[in-house]
């Protein structure tokens, strides 16, 4: 997945800034259909986005799914080129402008996502990644978001330096790895007319599910994922603390060795003997490699996302609970009368 955009030419060499993403209804329907089909098998759905760049708007007009990774006989690069070549023959936009993937329990931030978008953005400057949340959309809230890597994140990945010092220098945190790009859905006038006619034919929704309080499974999934991420972050913290303890012990040993050498050199100087250089002692203490903090940063971002989703979900559930209680009290009062 990480190098699927690696061999495509840049679509535009001028300004690579995208102010917003405009997605056709057809492309949205194809993404939604693919993501929901793969979610039934607990697989991650991924695909390519096709379109063009107009001024500072990225227009997504079509898309197609990537072949499943389990098919070893499939050449992914050749598959993509073949699909785009055939789309070009029928006069369909065939420029590769990004990719999409489904989301797992409302959380899409991962190391694989970061690597893939880095390869796309360094080869296709205007590319975006569109994330579709299947679980939230299944509850009636269409969740479609577009992201791009920030310049700081791209620079950090180019340098290949994920140490704490690099994060501080570039001022990179989990909240500044990706920048969300506004996304709008556009339909043709004929599509809007058809949707209006279909809306009149559909039966009116009575709205009896709006106050449904059966939300235990959704909250349980978020809590389980949150606990797993917190445990991963704890393990990362333990490893980093061990590194700091080793560095502190090494510095203490080096300082004691240098102090001992200074005393010995003072004795040698008083006797007129040549002194020993400090570099001989320093060579004995090799600097410890600094552990990368990228995984911990991504895990922190996942924890933050799950916490926000839980807070939002609980506030909605509490509102439903109070409304239901008021309706129940009103019903009981009416029955008493």
Swiss-Prot record:
GO biological process: formation of cytoplasmic translation initiation complex
Compartments in which it is found: Cytoplasm
UniProt entry tagged with the keyword Cell membrane: no
Pfam families xref list: eIF3h_C, JAB
GO molecular function terms noted in the UniProt entry: metallopeptidase activity; translation initiation factor activity
GO cellular component, one term: eukaryotic 48S preinitiation complex
Record key words, sorted: Cytoplasm, Initiation factor, Protein biosynthesis
Domain MPN: 21-153
Superkingdom of the organism of origin: Eukaryota
Keyword Protein biosynthesis assigned: yes
Family from the record: Belongs to the eIF-3 subunit H family.
Stored HAMAP family: eIF3h (MF_03007)
Subunit structure: Component of the eukaryotic translation initiation factor 3 (eIF-3) complex. The eIF-3 complex interacts with pix. Interacts with mxt.
Role noted for this protein: Component of the eukaryotic translation initiation factor 3 (eIF-3) complex, which is involved in protein synthesis of a specialized repertoire of mRNAs and, together with other initiation factors, stimulates binding of mRNA and methionyl-tRNAi to the 40S ribosome. The eIF-3 complex specifically targets and initiates translation of a subset of mRNAs involved in cell proliferation.
Protein name per the record: Eukaryotic translation initiation factor 3 subunit H
Species: Drosophila pseudoobscura pseudoobscura
């Amino acid at each position: 997945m990480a190098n699927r955009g690696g061999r495509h030419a840049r679509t535009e060499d001028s300004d690579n800034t995208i102010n917003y993403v405009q997605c056709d209804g057809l492309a949205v329907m194809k993404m939604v259909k693919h993501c929901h089909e793969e979610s039934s098998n607990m697989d991650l759905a991924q695909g390519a986005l096709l379109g063009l760049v107009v001024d500072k708007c990225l227009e997504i007009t079509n898309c197609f799914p990537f072949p499943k990774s389990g098919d070893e006989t499939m050449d992914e690069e050749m598959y993509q080129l073949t699909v785009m070549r055939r789309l070009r023959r029928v006069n369909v936009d065939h420029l590769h402008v990004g990719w999409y993937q489904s989301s797992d329990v409302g959380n899409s931030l991962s190391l694989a996502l970061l690597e893939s978008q880095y390869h796309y953005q360094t080869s296709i400057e205007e590319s975006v990644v569109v994330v579709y949340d299947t679980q939230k959309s299944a509850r009636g809230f269409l969740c479609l978001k577009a992201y791009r890597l920030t310049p700081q994140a791209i620079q950090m990945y180019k340098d290949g330096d994920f140490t704490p010092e690099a994060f501080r220098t570039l001022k990179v945190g989990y909240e500044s790895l990706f920048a969300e790009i506004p996304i709008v859905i556009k339909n043709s006038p004929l599509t809007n007319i058809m949707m209006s006619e279909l809306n009149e034919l559909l039966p009116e929704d009575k709205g009896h599910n709006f106050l449904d309080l059966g939300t235990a499974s959704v909250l349980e999934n978020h809590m389980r994922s949150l606990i797993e991420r917190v445990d991963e972050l704890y393990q990362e913290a333990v490893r980093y603390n061990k590194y700091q303890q080793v560095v502190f012990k090494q510095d203490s040993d080096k300082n004691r060795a240098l102090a001992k050498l200074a005393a010995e050199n003072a004795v040698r100087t008083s006797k007129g003997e040549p002194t020993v250089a400090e570099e001989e002692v320093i060579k004995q203490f090799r600097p410890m490699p600094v552990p990368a903090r990228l995984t911990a940063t991504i895990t922190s971002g996942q924890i933050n996302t799950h916490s926000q989703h839980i807070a939002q979900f609980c506030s909605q559930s509490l509102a439903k609970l109070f409304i239901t209680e008021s309706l129940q009290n009103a019903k009981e009062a009416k029955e008493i009368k």
